[in-house]
């Protein structure tokens, strides 16, 4: 099963194609340009270089959230459009579950962290053992202080991954919670991990139509919060 995956949840943008656990091609860009300018050229570039077309894909996956509101909207909209154009199913992947796959080899707890501002992070915690991941919490927005209290009670080794990893690491260290950062080349979210997580979901039947694919924000955008006041 060939899966094209898109990752636009933070500053960087990436795309990858995976087949049966093997990465066939991938592209990554972190140049400060908007995702609306860079995503589709990356998709076109990797497919062309791998001598693939959209018709060769069996499903389109995307990091559906949480993450940057604008980034998630762009990624989900692109995935919906691509899936609809070639009449293929879509797979919405948790940004946090995907990034946990970066360090599934690191036995212990995997703490996924994205900066959600206001002293909070988007977070999920997994247990990694022998390359397998077990989810311990739901995706959530949590105060760093509350996360520190949770982690103090758990003696297992802790690896932090995600674009908010440094923020989380510094806070936990100051709170006397032993932890470590994921290696630099694995700390950030990427489309390859989105594709690998999508394979697991597809095997469980978690396919959806382009029309049904929806972003997952966890909390309202700033503009919506202001309208509600």
List where the protein language model places each region.
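DPxDG-like acidic metal-binding loop motif
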Residues: 61-90, 95
């Amino acid at each position: 099963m060939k899966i094209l995956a898109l990752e636009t949840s933070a500053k960087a943008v990436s795309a990858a194609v995976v087949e049966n656990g093997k990465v066939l091609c991938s592209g990554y860009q972190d140049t400060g340009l908007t995702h609306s300018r860079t995503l589709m050229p990356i998709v076109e570039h990797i497919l062309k270089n791998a001598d693939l077309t959209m018709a060769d894909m069996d499903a389109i996956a995307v990091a559906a959230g949480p993450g940057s509101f604008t980034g998630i909207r762009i990624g989900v909209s692109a995935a919906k459009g691509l899936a609809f154009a070639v009449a293929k199913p879509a797979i919405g992947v948790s940004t946090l579950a995907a990034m946990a796959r970066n360090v599934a080899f690191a036995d212990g707890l995997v703490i996924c962290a994205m900066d959600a501002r206001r002293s909070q992070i988007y977070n999920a915690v997994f247990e990694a053992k022998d390359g397998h991941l077990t989810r311990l919490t739901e995706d959530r927005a949590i105060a760093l202080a509350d996360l520190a209290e949770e982690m103090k009670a758990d003696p297992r080794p802790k690896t932090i991954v995600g674009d908010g990893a440094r923020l989380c690491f510094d806070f936990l260290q100051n709170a006397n919670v032993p932890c470590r950062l994921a290696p630099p080349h694995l700390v950030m979210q990427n489309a390859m991990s989105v594709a690998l997580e999508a394979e697991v979901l597809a095997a469980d039947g978690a396919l959806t139509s382009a029309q049904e694919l929806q972003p997952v924000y966890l909390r309202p955008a700033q503009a919506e919060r202001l309208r509600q006041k």
